Amino acid sequence: MKISNNSLGFLPTTFILVGIPGLESEHLWISVPFSLIYIIIFLGNGIILHVIRTDIALHQPMYLFLAMLALAEVRVSASTLPTVLGIFLFGNTEISLEACLFPDVLHPFFIHDGASCAAGHVFGPLYSHLQPTELHSYPDTAQGLWHRSYYRTEKHYAHGSVAHSLMASALLWPQCPLTFLLSAPQSYLSCGNISVNNIYGIFIVTSTFGLDSLLIVISYGLILHTVLGIATGEGRKKALNTCGSHVCAVLAYYVPMIGLSIVHRLGHRVSPLLQAMMANAYLFFPPVVNPIVYSIKTKEIHGAIVRMLLEKRRRV
């Protein structure tokens, strides 16, 4: 690690990303499954986006939120692609201080964006069940709410107070047992006062994931109450199947997120290998699983994909 001396104190100019601890000699082979994961992410979410864009029947609130979710997942994966493949495929383990601080702002912004889309996606079937006659006004309302929340989140991250406080705290962290840098371990290893970082982090998590979790629980409670009131067994089965795919999507976001938070709270007791595996699951599990879940569980998406493939086959 190279250290420079400036007005902020002693600052490291480069960090070393270990990747997966204990498997440094196998990084070339490890790059193969990671490359396949990225192919699945971009291909799967790209197909979802293409199908929703081209099929007019899918231009409905529920599928528009699904498109937002897929787009957010593509952005998260694209932001980690250079670092991850750089480590495993090319052995480029050094990262500059600027490149280290940049994901601290970028990754939470994209991931919070995706989690908010997942929460908003729940309100599509809820609103259509409770107000079926007013469904035509829902896309405009949803779009306005999404843009306002997007703007506020962007405004929080654009001020850059957290990144500046990290630099002012003079980080001394020569090695990171992950394929990317997380703000939690960075803050613990800083040499200055990190109270602002901790308060800001708690506020962001509470106002995004905490609020999303509460709204999701309330929404599914109302959906379940509505579904149980459906007279026909076929309609009940269809509604429960749709809700099941939504639950899988939400769990794909929140389970790795909660697991990684617990691991980092107990970081001094947990092996670096487990931390690395949890961190990678946190980044890669939702983008990989969600396209598979929706292409299988959602009948409309599945049918649109089949029609697209059959049309491509006839053209060939």
Curated annotation (Swiss-Prot):
Segments in the Cytoplasmic topological domain: 53-63, 126-161, 213-242, 297-316
Intrachain S-S bonds: C100-C191
For this protein, what is any one GO molecular function term?
Answer: G protein-coupled receptor activity
Q: Which residues lie on this side of the membrane: Extracellular?
A: 1-31, 85-104, 183-191, 264-275
Q: Which organism is it from?
A: Homo sapiens
Pfam families (UniProt xref): 7tm_4
Q: Which family does it belong to?
A: Belongs to the G-protein coupled receptor 1 family.
> What GO terms fall under cellular component here?
membrane; plasma membrane
Describe its membrane topology.
Multi-pass membrane protein
Write out the entry's keywords from A to Z: Cell membrane, Disulfide bond, G-protein coupled receptor, Glycoprotein, Membrane, Olfaction, Receptor, Sensory transduction, Transducer, Transmembrane, Transmembrane helix
Q: What is this protein called?
A: Olfactory receptor 51J1
